[in-house]
């Protein structure tokens, strides 16, 4: 459960991202594909080469979803319900992949904002991304 301090850290950090959430999402997705090649199996129709327009476009969706989640920290299940349905029932993404992508999101954020990525912020962002992953996989059960 995200504490008030966690929510404050996440919101404050997200303001530093500005309009780069989509760009960072694309970078995190590319990093996921490179670091965890088995994640590519869900994208057989994509050009997965570095800098691919398809990876960038899907990464923007990831960034936009995280931005949506930041705006609804008190109701993540409600805000992410449609995405949860999509990933559980239509796309059938293995839940472990959310953890892998979440790790790559954290790495990407830390690389772009090292001064703001303090241990406390890191812990809060990790809890946030874990909570988002839990919500997205909640309809698998």
UniProtKB/Swiss-Prot annotation:
For the keyword Phosphoprotein, the answer is: yes
- Which residues take part in binding heme b? 87
Q: Which UniProt keywords apply?
A: Acetylation, Heme, Iron, Metal-binding, Oxygen transport, Phosphoprotein, Transport
Locate the N6-succinyllysine modifications and list their residues: 7, 11, 16, 40
Q: Which residues carry this modification: Phosphoserine?
A: 3, 35, 49, 124, 138
Return one Gene Ontology term, BP aspect.
hydrogen peroxide catabolic process
Q: Give the modified residues of type Phosphotyrosine.
A: 24
Q: In which tissues is it expressed?
A: Red blood cells.
Q: Coiled coil as a keyword?
A: no
Q: Which residues carry this modification: Phosphothreonine?
A: 108, 134, 137
Q: Which GO terms describe its molecular function?
A: haptoglobin binding; heme binding; iron ion binding; organic acid binding; oxygen binding; oxygen carrier activity; peroxidase activity
Domain Globin, first and last residues per copy: 1-141
- Residues noted as binding O2 in the record, renumbered to the chain: 58
- InterPro entries in the record, alphabetically? Globin, Globin-like_sf, Globin/Proto, Hemoglobin_a-typ, Hemoglobin_oxygen_transport, Hemoglobin_pi
- Pfam families registered for this protein in UniProt: Globin
> Where N6-acetyllysine occurs along the chain?
16
Superkingdom as given in the UniProt entry: Eukaryota
A GO cellular component term found in this entry reads: hemoglobin complex
Q: Which purpose does this protein serve, as stated in its record?
A: Involved in oxygen transport from the lung to the various peripheral tissues.
- Please describe the quaternary structure of this protein: Heterotetramer of two alpha chains and two beta chains.
Recorded family membership? Belongs to the globin family.
Indicate what this protein is called per its UniProt record. Answer: Hemoglobin subunit alpha
Query: Which lineage do the record's taxonomy fields give for this organism?
Result: Eukaryota, Metazoa, Chordata, Craniata, Vertebrata
């Amino acid at each position: 459960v995200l504490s008030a301090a966690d929510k404050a850290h996440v919101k404050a950090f997200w303001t530093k991202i500005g309009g780069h959430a989509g760009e960072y999402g694309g970078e995190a997705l590319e990093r996921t594909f490179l670091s965890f090649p088995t994640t590519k199996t869900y994208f057989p129709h994509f050009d997965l080469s570095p800098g691919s327009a398809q990876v960038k476009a899907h990464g923007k969706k990831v960034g936009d979803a995280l931005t949506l989640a930041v705006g609804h920290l008190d109701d993540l299940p409600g805000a992410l319900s449609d995405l949860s349905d999509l990933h559980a029932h239509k796309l059938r993404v293995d839940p472990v992949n959310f953890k892998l992508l979440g790790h790559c999101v954290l790495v990407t954020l830390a690389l772009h904002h090292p001064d703001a990525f303090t241990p406390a912020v890191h812990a809060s962002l990790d809890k946030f991304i874990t909570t988002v992953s839990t919500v997205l996989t909640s309809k698998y059960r």
